[in-house]
Amino acid sequence: MKKVTYFHLATCPYCKQADRAIEELIAEHPEYAAVEFERINEYEHPEIADQYDYQCNPCMFIGKEKIYESHLFEKADECRMHVEKVLKRALEA
């Protein structure tokens, strides 16, 4: 299993949407609780964020591979689908 590096912002509505998706998916699939997230606020740690190639938050990487990056006007169900893909990939790795 691999760690997920999760870039977020405290006031980002799309990040809150991703957080809800993580909570819901773990409640539905307890095996996802084993996935370790390294949550990095890009405002607080720009020196880390600058090492990764992304434009939007939330954004999730496994290693240096970008698995999910949100986009403007992303709907909750689309976010959830991408977050589940991240969780599955982390468990398989």
Regions found by a protein language model. Give the residues of each.
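Local sequence-structure signature of Cys/Sec-based thiol-disulfide redox active-site neighborhoods
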Residues: 1-28
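Short alpha-helical
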Residues: 13, 44, 74
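Secondary-structure boundary motif
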Residues: 27-31, 92
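Thiol-based oxidoreductase modules, predominantly thioredoxin-like and allied folds used
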Residues: 32-46
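A hydrophobic alpha-helix adjacent to the NAD(P)-binding/active-site core of NAD(P)-dependent oxidoreductases
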Residues: 49
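Structural micro-motif
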Residues: 52-62
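Non-catalytic, surface beta->alpha helical segment in thiol-disulfide oxidoreductase systems
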Residues: 62-93
